[in-house]
């Protein structure tokens, strides 16, 4: 291996990309062919074979009483909020440190997203900030289980019960993670999951909704199916303006295999994450976000998040170090992964198009609209995200990651002098 940094003309540690596509199971092609042979591609309304089978399989593994697959994990949030009774002008509290789709789902139903700061230890929504933000217009709290973390569901449940609010868990990262032995997504009044192409379980696109209450579930079903009723249920037909958020039989058939493979892949990621954390601890400067909270009885590893310590890198900024590691063929992500919502270029929300935000935010929701110092610092200076694709390969993949980081650390003076 060249000891000279690739950033300055040396040979990179790795030239091949990590595989980040879906993992194909032994029965996936047979299931997809069965859909093609059937000529029946639609997913809902029931009874459609693979959608029903997948919904039963997924909700059964989650321990949820009701659930349905939808077209993606953003519209699922909008549907859930409507099903929970959120109306135009209502306020929904969520974290400022998440993919902007969490907040966009609130805006798209003409409700007002109230962005609050994150807990400095877990980087999930701060319960104290949630309670401080509650007003008479607040209807729902939307925590996000970020990366391999879980929001403090005990504290959030106590706050919600105290103030008569609902909880919608954004579980796009947390498939089958567990809090006190119960899957996340099932602790709140509703839960939303994503099967987008980067997720640990994917059909290219797709989402899933779970509910604790049958009426909420029936509202979800109607809202996802153009306002129609489920056969045999007429509680909402004719009174609900819905979306076409239906997932197809092809997506549902493929997702059955994703559930079947999950536990084996999860075990691989968990072992790799432990080895990576131990290896980075020896190198120094990367500390895992979070703590050993005993209430987290199973983590998920969509992303493992580390906190960068500039003191361990002679004052270099995180982005300088990550750029050098990237040149070695290893992509560890910083603020490009998740800028705070109010600083995301994709979160284009102004009062001309969305007048309900004007009273709280003025002309637009932008960089100066809210003060979220912990989220801002995490995104701009501290966060290092390791995608699950880097954790699902073989020992060589893991070795390449650690070798690249160590190589940059060994050439720290050269990097520092060039900064």
Curated annotation (Swiss-Prot):
Q: Which UniProt keywords apply?
A: Aminotransferase, Antibiotic biosynthesis, Pyridoxal phosphate, Transferase
* Protein's UniProt keywords contain Transferase: yes
Pathway annotation = Metabolic intermediate biosynthesis; 2-deoxystreptamine biosynthesis; 2-deoxystreptamine from D-glucose 6-phosphate: step 4/4; Antibiotic biosynthesis; kanamycin biosynthesis
Gene3D superfamilies tied to this protein: Aspartate Aminotransferase, domain 1, Type I PLP-dependent aspartate aminotransferase-like (Major domain)
Q: Which GO terms describe its biological process?
A: antibiotic biosynthetic process; polysaccharide biosynthetic process
What PANTHER family does the annotation carry?
Answer: DTDP-4-AMINO-4,6-DIDEOXYGALACTOSE TRANSAMINASE, TRANSAMINASE
Similarity comment: family membership: Belongs to the DegT/DnrJ/EryC1 family. L-glutamine:2-deoxy-scyllo-inosose/scyllo-inosose aminotransferase subfamily.
User: What is the protein named?
Assistant: Putative L-glutamine:3-amino-2,3-dideoxy-scyllo-inosose aminotransferase
Write down the species.
Streptomyces kanamyceticus
Gene behind this protein: kanD
